């Protein structure tokens, strides 16, 4: 069976993930007696991954798997933190990223991962995008290789501030320079020139900015690839308290999908 379109994983990766989840369970997924679960572990893990990949409603996923929305809700609540845990080793830490980027030029970009407007969490409002969400920082090499993805910060956090708070600035210190967009001015990254107040950019400034943009294209592709996990691209709808586990699980699946089986 092909899993890539629904979960982002190839067959062997899904098999490996199920094996890891099974080993991490406190007790067998299906009891030896009593009523069996409506989905076996393989199908349940697939449903949880489908939720992260597609950000579809639980009712829709239940229909696809011939089970109920409450069942998908329960399985998602149990399995998403497990997916995060068993794949954590594939997510590069800042220290791992420093080893990769030493002496090499890096590309940095920030992205907003949108979520519902939780009334009690006004810090998630992002003025630039005029919506609520979280700020994540991504670093790639010039060839687009994913070096690091930060954890999420509140959506109100400006990229320049997030660059420092997430540890991306420490990674830059060990790199051989880096490029960012206008939101990173003053961080040590090479950035495009802003239009002066009441003036216009010169032709040479426009050409310079165009070159910066072309250099940054690989990290923008990385952002797009990362956000193929639709829970990072469209509004996250589950309770606020579950967001960080879901983000971490999606991030882990992203790195797992581009590394495991390709050594």
Question: Could you tell me what each predicted segment is?
Answer:
Residues 37, 51, 62:
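Short, charged/polar micro-motifs that form catalytic or ligand-binding hotspots
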Residues 60-77, 81-263:
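Short, well-ordered secondary-structure "scaffold" segments embedded in the functional core
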